[in-house]
């Protein structure tokens, strides 16, 4: 039994009295969920012990989704240190869709691609290039994003947009200016929105995570307008 480590008490009979009438209100927040973050060693060891693999399977995620739904949630960022949710087992994404769970991704996993997918696929897909850079490898990165969107387009999702560096790092070198960073992020998001319109639909829900240094790019300064003043993301979710 996996229900927050609480084993239900067994009873021979259960009586529901007619006087008991509880109607739960509809949640006021549209997207409600959690991120399985920094999953090693706790989540990973549990997955290995109970399901035989550090790479979570649909059999494992069924319990996670059930827990999420019992908590009145509907949205998840899957584990991504040692696993790639859709690439390892696409059945994970299909199961989430079947159970009514909306799948997103963290601040550095845009366009339905898990954090480790590029490191894995660039070894076998030369069309993606080898550098995680929208300055030197924009064409390859765009193909990588496009294929992720096409793979997951029929599953309900909240698509993360934006871009950070590999392994949860800064995207640009340390000597890059605020304007440099804002401009490359704008270029990446513009391309992502074009791909989303082509592969899914333009009005599909999208999220930009304002995390760490991205907050500086969002705010800008007195000399450099930030992303908060950019009309292209005006209708998107800012987190």
Please place each PLM-identified region on the residue numbering.
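Feature activates predominantly on carbohydrate-active enzymes
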Residues: 1-138
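Gly/Pro-rich turn-and-neighbor structural signature
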Residues: 6-18, 23, 81, 87-93, ...
């Amino acid at each position: 039994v996996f229900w927050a480590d609480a084993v239900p008490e067994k009873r021979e009979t259960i009586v529901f009295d007619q006087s008991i009438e509880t109607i739960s209100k509809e949640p006021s927040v549209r997207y409600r969920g959690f991120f399985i973050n920094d999953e090693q060693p706790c989540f990973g060891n549990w997955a290995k012990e109970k399901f035989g693999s550090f790479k979570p399977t649909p059999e494992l995620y069924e319990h996670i989704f059930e827990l999420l739904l019992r908590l009145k949630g509907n949205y998840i960022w899957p584990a991504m240190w040692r696993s790639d949710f859709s690439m390892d087992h696409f059945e994970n994404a299909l199961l989430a869709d079947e159970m009514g769970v909306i799948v997103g991704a963290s601040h550095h996993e845009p366009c339905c691609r898990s954090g480790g997918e590029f490191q894995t696929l660039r070894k076998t897909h030369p069309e993606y290039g080898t550098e995680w850079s929208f300055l030197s490898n924009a064409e390859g990165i765009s193909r990588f994003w496009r294929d992720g969107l096409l793979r997951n387009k029929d599953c309900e999702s909240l698509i993360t947009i934006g871009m950070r560096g590999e392994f949860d790092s800064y995207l640009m070198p340390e000597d890059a200016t605020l304007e440099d960073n804002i401009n490359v992020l704008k270029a990446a998001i513009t391309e992502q929105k074009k791909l989303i319109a082509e592969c899914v639909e333009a009005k599909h829900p999208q999220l930009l995570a304002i995390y760490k240094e991205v907050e500086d790019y969002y705010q800008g300064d007195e000399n450099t307008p930030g992303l908060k003043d950019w009309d292209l993301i005006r209708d998107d979710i800012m987190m």
